[in-house]
């Protein structure tokens, strides 16, 4: 009550912000005539002037009015588009690091140019993030003439681009790309072994288009770079035969082997189900007699069984995935797009492959990962645009510290949003949908039908075919035709059936998108220039008449075939109609068989329906029901927010560790001299080893000197008789032992360094350190995954799972860091270097490395290169081909036991002959 009174007196926070922005708009508008009077050359010179003013200490905020005025005028000259006042407000919202909520058709792509131009002047790079490669390329192509006119360069990052091209794209002033590509490049940059292989610059400023889709819908999906792990493919096939033998129970307390919690998206085995599954697995020979699935040795079996059950009960073809070219391709539940290249983790993808009888690919092991939540929080400044952010404003504020500002439309919205119509069954609902479409088609009103799955879009398409109604289907299977279909969805009588329209990125223009049609004519090579011009002229003449006819028919009519879990997705579908003051309408058709109504058991609504509409095919519509349904959606949104927040809380633990590892890795990559760091590592490792077997403040009787000597010999090739030291000097203690051992190791290491040269040794050290860190980090990520999967069980012991996870993760990270230091010290101190008897030191200083030996069986694995590879690199820096074929072509005859012609000193069969 008091809040409402205060809002009436002082206005809302949004109103106050808009008031401030309008003052700046007035200053920008005051400069318009001045900018229009400038020649092209003078207008272009403004960019250099702004850069100089920034270099002289002026701030971006200080030059904002002039920069926005310049960008607006340049846009008018190059693109033929002038920014409206509300678009100027949107640009300022983005510059301030906030989210601009702008309705569909309000020109978000043009709005971004203002903030992008201003921030690009700082020379630190600006990233414009879109949801797919098509939109990234399209938006960059549309806006490049504007940016180039203003003296700025534009790059585009798309999948399958080579590293060199990526470096060039990131070096541009403005870089367009998808959230996936930006995130994966960040991870790949933190896996390189040479700093010059990195592609990204510092993460400065990002403008995220469809920000709700990227930062909320995809927040639960981490970006993962992975490699194939050892996996038993046959086990997935065998486990696939088990679910059909188990009985599904209707409720948690019912009779059967398992029940499905659709709300939580989980499958739970009952006690009887465990026993039944154990019997089946015992008969198959996978489980020993009287053994349990709960025993530690059978965790893998349990893992595969639950994956198979989830694949059979929770994941459905043409809803959650499609089969394309013999592969399982995931369908994005929010947009209906195919997510090629994405795979479910924890063996689920393999279980679905087994269910569908396609080739099963090995499960992957995580090499590097990050969530979008943590990736985008790395930017110095982050902003976003969307048509629907207000419903998620709290989440944007609490997780990303992003305030949402609702930008008023340039023209009032005239769309009519009718109440939902609710039917008993899905069959009755779809009959009503077809009837509504038929009526619209008769009066020439275009219709967009939104469905939540590919299965439903194909069902609607089938019903329309039976009714003889021509239509287009737009779902994940028709991805390539997507933009063309959407562009023409506003033509007279057009019927378009589409899975969720979120993120489609193309405006529906009443009367059809004239530009798309004229572009298609211009691209038709079969037509002469005269024919093209004639067709374009005829098209332009007829377009206005068609546009007027659609306006008279009521504009675009939106039909939703069911409510989505998120109100935001429903609003995005509705928002396709009524763009820029156009007329339009929307209505949702629901049934009590729809997942949302079924799962949230709207008993009261069902009772009302039975009382008010007893006849078949009769629907009810009432504000009370609509509010109840929105209440159910709020429950789901709240639950999903809690899940995303929980993912973030757990990932924040790994994120802090990731920052430490990546920071250390970067320091190693960029430091010219790492000798001090190496010395510190050797000292720490020796000290820890001595403390382990000679604990500080302990009695001499508690010391384990023989084991210490054995460890030093095995791990560091250090053969020291410590026991004789102790006999010779009774006063000696652990600290003295440490100092002597460190001195011996340092002397030996200095001798090796002198033998091969300081730079060669530094390069070798750097390579070893990076390989060790990467391998140890990879194993640590796997261990963290296992910890995360089972940590919820701690709650049964009255412990807080999150606190337990943090505590154990911290201990594991300490062990990881100690393990990294130990492996680095062990590998580098145990390496033996022999002087090359052939090569002349003065001529080939790097040639001193002849061969590298190590007692450690992990040497080759940890280095990632064999001894031969390292020697070959050293003696063949220009990549000369010494294969038998190449030597024969050059007229050289080299036998297997002859010295390798590369100069390594090794026999040919042990060097390039081995590689061949």
Curated annotation (Swiss-Prot):
SUPFAM superfamilies: Helical scaffold and wing domains of SecA, P-loop containing nucleoside triphosphate hydrolases, Pre-protein crosslinking domain of SecA. Coiled coil: none annotated. The keyword Chaperone does not apply. PROSITE patterns: SECA, SECA_MOTOR_DEAD. One of its GO terms (molecular function) is ATP binding. GO terms for cellular component: cell envelope Sec protein transport complex; cytosol; plasma membrane. It is a peripheral membrane protein. Its EC number is 7.4.2.8. Transmembrane segments: none annotated. It comes from the Bacteria. Its cofactor is Zn(2+). May bind 1 zinc ion per subunit. It holds the Pfam family SEC-C. Zn(2+) binds at residues 900, 902, 911-912. InterPro entries: Helicase_ATP-bd (IPR014001), Helicase_C-like (IPR001650), P-loop_NTPase (IPR027417), SEC_C_motif (IPR004027), SecA (IPR000185), SecA_CS (IPR020937), SecA_DEAD (IPR011115), SecA_motor_DEAD (IPR014018). ATP binds at residues 87, 105-109, 507. The keyword rRNA-binding does not apply. It catalyses: ATP + H2O + cellular proteinSide 1 = ADP + phosphate + cellular proteinSide 2. Keywords: ATP-binding, Cell inner membrane, Cell membrane, Cytoplasm, Membrane, Metal-binding, Nucleotide-binding, Protein transport, Translocase, Translocation, Transport, Zinc. GO terms for biological process: intracellular protein transmembrane transport; protein import; protein targeting; protein transport by the Sec complex. It is found in: Cell inner membrane; Cytoplasm. Belongs to the SecA family. Monomer and homodimer. Part of the essential Sec protein translocation apparatus which comprises SecA, SecYEG and auxiliary proteins SecDF-YajC and YidC. Part of the Sec protein translocase complex. Interacts with the SecYEG preprotein conducting channel. Has a central role in coupling the hydrolysis of ATP to the transfer of proteins into and across the cell membrane, serving both as a receptor for the preprotein-SecB complex and as an ATP-driven molecular motor driving the stepwise translocation of polypeptide chains across the membrane. This is Protein translocase subunit SecA. It comes from Neisseria meningitidis serogroup A / serotype 4A (strain DSM 15465 / Z2491). The gene is secA.
